[in-house]
Amino acid sequence: IAVHEPLVPLVDHLPEATLAFELPTPFPVGPVNCYVLLDSPVTVVDPGMLFGQTLATLVAELGGVGLGVRDVEAVVVTHAHPDHYGTAGWLAEQADAPIYAGRAELPKLLDTRDRHQLYELIRTFGIPEDMLGVFPAFYGAVQQWLHVIDESRVIPVDDGDTLWLGGRPLEAMVTPGHAAGHLSLWEPTSSRLLSGDHLLPSITPNPLVELDHESDLLRRRSLVEYLDSLARFETLNPDVVLPGHGPAFTSVAQLVATTRLHHLSRADEILAHIQRTGAP
């Protein structure tokens, strides 16, 4: 993970009735952002991983605005990566609350066998055996940071759905690429965009290898999906973007252009290498 200086202007104000704070992780990416939409239904977006410091921070931040865990009325998971959702099952259980997540994230959210199937796919890519050993070790370690999610609490979200959360209607945008069912939330009335990890000010999001559960292909075309999803953000022009990592920012079109150029340039480099070496 390469963290760099922000590529766009930052903003130091948040939309009304919104709490934002960082939750620690043991990963190189550093802390993850958690957002609480304070109007009813009180909604926590990305409650972090099942990690002692994370839980303590989450409880303390809620307490700072006079809320307890049981005051939470809804949980949103932007995508099923451990740093964002590991605590979601615990929080929903404690609060007796539903969990909203993109429909294509459910295989990862509810069944960790998906990760082992992905490992078997990655083995076919010709990666050296010594490097392959990293994957099962990581997948095994990840389990300690994930609370089992009760499937009956999960509400699958599709693109274009309107979700009434935090006292306002939010438009669901399924923006695949970094994750198959990555969920971004757009609020046109306040010109606010919760972008998850789809667009970040100080990290270039990486389209990840994902199993394809919806077609005969072994894997999803993550880079193509990511670039297509980026194009949707260009037309929004929000006043403030609340990302999964890093500070809130503006100038979405500028960041979209920079991010797109980065990925296309890297793709050109890889193509040139394949043509030069004859690698399959």
Model-predicted segments: where are they?
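Conserved beta-strand hairpin/beta-sheet module of binuclear metal-dependent hydrolase folds
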Residues: P9-V65, D71, L185-P201
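Short, structured coil segments at secondary-structure junctions
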Residues: L14, Q94-A95, N237
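Short Pro/Gly-enriched beta-strand edge/turn motifs at strand-loop
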Residues: L14-E22, A141-L146, G166-R168
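Short beta-strand or tight-loop elements
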Residues: A17-L19, L58, R153, D159-D161, ...
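Active-site HxH/HxHxD metal-binding segment of metal-dependent hydrolases
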Residues: G30, Q53-L55, G63-W164, S191, ...
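Metallo-beta-lactamase
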Residues: T43, M49-F51, Q143-V154, P169-A267
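Short capping segments at the starts of secondary-structure elements
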Residues: A272-P280
